[in-house]
Curated annotation (Swiss-Prot):
One of its GO terms (molecular function) is pantetheine-phosphate adenylyltransferase activity. It is an enzyme of class 2 (transferase). It catalyses: (R)-4'-phosphopantetheine + ATP + H(+) = 3'-dephospho-CoA + diphosphate. Its main location: cytoplasm. GO terms for cellular component: cytoplasm. Its EC number is 2.7.7.3. It comes from Pyrobaculum aerophilum (strain ATCC 51768 / DSM 7523 / JCM 9630 / CIP 104966 / NBRC 100827 / IM2). Reversibly transfers an adenylyl group from ATP to 4'-phosphopantetheine, yielding dephospho-CoA (dPCoA) and pyrophosphate. This is Phosphopantetheine adenylyltransferase.
Length: 155
């Protein structure tokens, strides 16, 4: 199968995997032959998350398992990122970036950084938000908060 782009990138913390992550990852597999996923390091995640995320090794294993279900035939590379940009700002092979509405500004910043380095901008694909049955935006943080509510705990 011929895909629109040879090399597609996306990134995130991927702590508690949910359908929003599936949508993001599936979009990348629909448009790209090779997928590069930037996964935040534990130290970088601790700078912007208000809670302790799962260890990098656990998040990576979960992400690999999910990608093997979404696109088992696809070539996927994983890279640990220590800043908001990762290799997206310096890898000239990257042609497209997939982002959520929440992370779209970061994708545009990445393209600005690429331009400063003399690299062509990537095409930006923005996916819509996934909501739960009550209209709340799904995120790892939201899921964690719901699970921590006293009424959520089973005795």
């Amino acid at each position: 199968m011929k895909y629109k782009f040879r090399n597609v990138v996306l990134g995130g913390t991927f702590d508690t995997l949910h359908s929003g992550h599936v949508k993001l990852l599936a979009t990348a597999t629909l448009i790209g032959d090779r997928i590069l996923i930037g996964l935040t390091s534990d130290s970088f995640a601790s700078t912007y998350k208000q809670y302790k995320v799962r260890p990098f090794s656990v998040r990576l294993a979960n992400l690999r398992n999910l990608m093997s279900l979404i696109a088992p035939e696809r070539e996927v590379a994983y890279v640990e990122i220590h800043d908001p940009y990762g290799p997206a700002v310096f890898d000239p092979r990257l042609e497209a970036i997939v982002a959520s509405i929440e992370t779209a500004p970061r994708a545009l910043q990445i393209n600005d950084e690429r331009a400063k380095r003399g690299l062509r901008p990537m095409e930006v694909f923005i996916i819509s938000t996934v909501r739960d049955g009550y209209g709340h935006t799904l995120s790892s943080t939201y899921i964690r908060r719901v699970l921590e509510r006293p009424e959520s705990k089973q005795s």
